[in-house]
Amino acid sequence: MAKAVAIVHHADRRTDVHMPYAPGIVVTRGRLVFLSGVTAAAVYHSHPHRDEEFDLPPTMREQAVLAMENLKKTLEAAGCGLPDLVSATRFLTDVREQDDLNRVWADYLEGHLPTTTTVEVSRLATHPRCKIEISAIAVTDDLHGGPEMAPKSFNRRGDAPSGSPASLGPPRRSRRGPR
């Protein structure tokens, strides 16, 4: 079944102002895709963090481009794309750089308007030089991605059962050792 989403507007909607977001979105059909926050850093990096893995550019524009590329890749891995975004929370370390982010955001979304919330934070957990993090929700067709996208059970660390289609790569070895 195809997804069904509708933008919600107030009865007193003003059409004489530019709105870079939708006031609300109703999802009546489709599969929800929840994305962890992405930054300009590589999605897959060591935990605890290692400084040498974070070669971050200095400007908001450059970091926003890298964050949007990471967002796009994660959406594609889930079987959808940027036009499927319905909500995003954007965390910035300096809200004065929001216009730089908005320009990159508009270039990538090409007129698509998910709901957005922008929050200024003192620091992001990924790295001290990180300027932006985007957390998002998308909706895609119920069957988009095929049976390999079916819900799986996960353990408390977020790993799918070994050998299941949701398990990416070889099973992880426990750091705890034998029990």
What residues fall within each predicted segment?
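N-terminal presequence-like segments and the immediate start of the first folded domain
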Residues: M1-E69, K73-S87, L92-R179
